[in-house]
Amino acid sequence: LPMMNLIQLDSIKVTAAQGKMPIYSERDVFQVMRQTITLPYGVVTDISPDIKLVLSNAGHILGSATCHFHIGNGDHNFVYTGDIKYGRSMLLESAYTNYPRVETLLIESTYGAKEDIQPSRQEVETAFISSVNSVLKDGGKVLIPIPAVGRAQELMMVIDKYMKSGELTEAPVFMEGMIQEATSIHESFPEYLVRELKQKILETDDNPFDSEYFTNVEHPNDRDEPLREGTPCIIIATSGML
């Protein structure tokens, strides 16, 4: 629910900044929040006399879910999902798909074509670390535009991991936009994160989101500071802050 609120309010700001008319107002968002009922994963909920709903982890972003509708007395089972991710990440478990029965599936199709074969995670991480090291060792600054929800937190974990291991050159990492707000929400719901990350947040002093490498740029007047300084650094920013 907090993540939904953050994303919807940000959408209003982005739309207005583009000179367009938002399709809903802040008042609409607050009204939706008051009328929203949250459901945990894996719980059967009667949403009408003959339809039952079960939400399951979609593996996309924090709180994302697939919707399994059991219609009638077992007459039909329908699954709807938006974005899904089958691979387990450093942040979330892979999407749940172990449904007893499914007659109809409505599914998103990003990267769904035969030629949409993505490189392995290790290949991507190796290439990323190599590129960043090249810039930092030359005294440069690395600007990484990224969505604030999901990918930013995953990237934070990658940077923290490789800097601690010595494979990535240590440098200050500045974060802009609503990344910090989204990260705080992740820390507030560790039960929805992968087991290893949940344990780090709850049981140790090794929370990667609180890493010494990260600095949040809170005020617009501070945005130029990382650029003025002559030291190498990494800047992680949402598109609205570029």
What role is predicted for each listed range?
Residues 1-154, 160-167, 172:
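His/Asp/Glu-rich metal-coordinating catalytic cores
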